[in-house]
Amino acid sequence: MPSIRLADLAQQLDAELHGDGDIVITGVASMQSAQTGHITFMVNPKYREHLGLCQASAVVMTQDDLPFAKSAALVVKNPYLTYARMAQILDTTPKPAQNIAPSAVIDETAKLGNNVSIGANAVIESGVELGDNVIIGAGCFVGKNSKIGAGSRLWANVTIYHEIQIGQNCLIQSGTVVGADGFGYANDRGNWVKIPQIGRVIIGDRVEIGACTTIDRGALDDTVIGNGVIIDNQCQIAHNVVIGDNTAVAGGVIMAGSLKIGRYCMIGGASVINGHMEICDKVTVTGMGMVMRPITEPGVYSSGIPLQPNKVWRKTAALVMNIDDMSKRLKSLERKVNQQD
């Protein structure tokens, strides 16, 4: 279990220490579950009333909240960002063994950097290049001529097809498939003719991809995931999609082929986005959004009807179904009124 003196933690976080710097911190916890040795954080003033009951040894908070502190405190401008950084310092995620498992199958032409770890039953095909400190989990497959940059990690059972490029310090969770064929077919009098997908997938640096996500290779041009992109679980990214730097994609999102998304966008969970169009920089699509047309102006966009009691929803649905008829009737009434005037 990691541990650190509160004073040392404050220094690493560039935080202002209030209280005993010799307190030993052994973990991060929520305000409700924290015990002695834990550090917690408060991001909303409405939780001030809970400080009296909180058992944490220290709390991260803003200057405005400091008068309400009942324990040692670290004062910062952004408690949530500080929480992320101290969680990294006190991370308890298991570290892989620094070795290559005897059951791993590695082609003799593969190039391995320094301190590479490869788990049991992993397969590394010919021409693969793994940078320094790369971690390949048990059961992974890395296809011919693919490249994985230094410091990147594949958790167990990740599949990387041939000719894929993954940048430095990336993280890919279990069950994800990168580089499978895109959904490309031509129709010959009712019969589907497969179009070989000869593009690649290019993934930038510091990209994180959740579990069981699929990113298809390009048909001709490449599918591209920019630097700093984060993608949640169970997303489908079709062939030739381009996602700009530092965009965030929540779980269950489906992106159709040849879509281009700008930088610093946020795509809410279960959204569906049409292909062959562009979304500009700094766009937020709220959850379950259905994006059928290009978005050319930054901002927040929503679609759909939020949850309602069933009886209310049925009335709403009936109104929506009849809105065209209602519009025609309204225009007819307007014409009659205008004629009377």
From Swiss-Prot:
It catalyses: a UDP-3-O-[(3R)-3-hydroxyacyl]-alpha-D-glucosamine + a (3R)-hydroxyacyl-[ACP] = a UDP-2-N,3-O-bis[(3R)-3-hydroxyacyl]-alpha-D-glucosamine + holo-[ACP] + H(+); UDP-3-O-[(3R)-3-hydroxytetradecanoyl]-alpha-D-glucosamine + (3R)-hydroxytetradecanoyl-[ACP] = UDP-2-N,3-O-bis[(3R)-3-hydroxytetradecanoyl]-alpha-D-glucosamine + holo-[ACP] + H(+). The active site is at residue 239. The keyword Lipid biosynthesis applies. The keyword S-adenosyl-L-methionine does not apply. Coiled coil: none annotated. Pathway: Glycolipid biosynthesis; lipid IV(A) biosynthesis; lipid IV(A) from (3R)-3-hydroxytetradecanoyl-[acyl-carrier-protein] and UDP-N-acetyl-alpha-D-glucosamine: step 3/6. Disulfide bonds: none annotated. InterPro entries: Hexapep, Hexapep_transf_CS, LpxD, Trimer_LpxA-like_sf, UDP_GlcNAc_AcTrfase_non-rep. Catalyzes the N-acylation of UDP-3-O-(hydroxytetradecanoyl)glucosamine using 3-hydroxytetradecanoyl-ACP as the acyl donor. Is involved in the biosynthesis of lipid A, a phosphorylated glycolipid that anchors the lipopolysaccharide to the outer membrane of the cell. Belongs to the transferase hexapeptide repeat family. LpxD subfamily. Homotrimer. This is UDP-3-O-(3-hydroxymyristoyl)glucosamine N-acyltransferase. It comes from Escherichia coli (strain UTI89 / UPEC). The gene is lpxD.
